[in-house]
Amino acid sequence: WASEPQIYGRFGYGLATRSCSVHVPRDPQALHPTVPTDPQVRLRLADPTDWKAFAGVYEDVATRRPGLPSRDERWWGRAVRDIAELRGGSSALRCVLAEDASGVRGYALYQTKQHFDENFGSGEVSVRELMAGDSPVLAEIYRYLFDLDLMGRTVLPRLPVDDPLLHWLQNPRRANPVLGDGLYVRLVDLDKALVSRTYAAELDVVLEVTDRHCPWNQGTWRLAVGAGDQAPRSCERTDRAAELALDVTDLGAAFLGGTSLSELELAGRVREDRPGAAAEASAAFAHFPAPWCPAIF
């Protein structure tokens, strides 16, 4: 996360993940009737400091979403930290688990803050973290959070940009979605970085890269990759004519698959010297689900 993005941009960091923040008014019927359910799922409250009970859910999501860092005990301690003096009138941190006979399949860490308007409860649910292994489990947790007693709205900061919630809400406008920036990525050894990730489609493209701070990245590179985990990948210097010209900042932005090189070309940040090269590279670099990093560090 960048304290001031323009500073990081000067040193080659590109905006690689985004998130969406929403404020959902309380409504037991907030979700459309067609939203998936799972009758086998049960919800129960748990001690948030017993994070080992739900850590597996986080790690499962992290293996599928680029940008989510793995956590050791110190990181988990930070994730569930609850300092009474810093609550600002909110409740202690709470945890709800979604589980079935196979075990825990989702969880949410949240706090509530009481407030009354003319004797009517209008408090706020503030969600610190929400992870689910699949859509039905995610929907069950949302239903719970959107109908807590005495609450007026639920605040969900930094959701993935492809989270299904806005498609599930019967009135998404009332959620006031706001798009925000997230993780900034800097490629230090671009050849090693580009062969370390998988690609969604075959690609053979020549990149002309500018890098003011890491001169070993500067120059023309041929990136040739196959699709999938086991496909061959190579990134080597070449004297072939460039097909895409870009700064290392923009390569960092595209690296996790959340920023399209075609978008950057449209914005004038990438120069396309061979027609179609940006679209081909965008298809190869793309990743679903979208990259995401809700943790601020």
Language-model segment annotations:
Residues W1-A30, K52:
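Active-site-proximal cofactor/substrate-binding loop regions of enzyme domains
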